[in-house]
UniProtKB/Swiss-Prot annotation:
Keywords: Cytoplasm, Methyltransferase, rRNA processing, S-adenosyl-L-methionine, Transferase. Coiled coil: none annotated. The keyword Methyltransferase applies. PANTHER family: METHYLTRANSFERASE, RIBOSOMAL RNA LARGE SUBUNIT METHYLTRANSFERASE H. Its EC number is 2.1.1.177. S-adenosyl-L-methionine binds at L76, G108, F127, S128, K129, M130, T131, F132. This is Ribosomal RNA large subunit methyltransferase H. It is found in: Cytoplasm. One of its GO terms (molecular function) is rRNA (pseudouridine-N3-)-methyltransferase activity. HAMAP family: 23SrRNA_methyltr_H (MF_00658). Belongs to the RNA methyltransferase RlmH family. It comes from Macrococcus caseolyticus (strain JCSC5402) (Macrococcoides caseolyticum).
Amino acid sequence: MKITIITVGKLKEKYWKMAVDEYVKRLGAYSKIELVEVADEKDSDNMSEKDIEIAKRKEAERILSKVKDDSFVYTLEILGKQLDSVQLAKEMEQKMNTGKSHLTFIIGGSNGLHQNVMDRSNYALSFSKMTFPHQMMKVILLEQIYRGFRIMKGQAYHK
């Protein structure tokens, strides 16, 4: 099983990098993890809707160029389906059991995802109706994937 996580923007703060590294290390026992960061567009508070759409489209082109054709794609969206940890574990396990050997999770930038990325998505997943910084979301996602593997294996981490 290979899992790719594509994010818009780079992790800059050391504490986020340390958390990501810790979960990537833990996940190594279960899966090959690939982290892909694509450049984000410059953002300002006074961007017009048109400018935001152009920025999202440019980010979408970068994201989609990194998505493999054979990958099952999850996009993280506020309006996606909310699952608890056990349900996410079952979702991932079901994909593995039906021959999906490559899962890709996509986290958008500060303006969200362009429709082209959502159109490529096989599953819109939501962790909350709230918005989180993409740096934090990357750590939360990695933790939940790790928790999911522990649940699948019947290991005690999730209790």
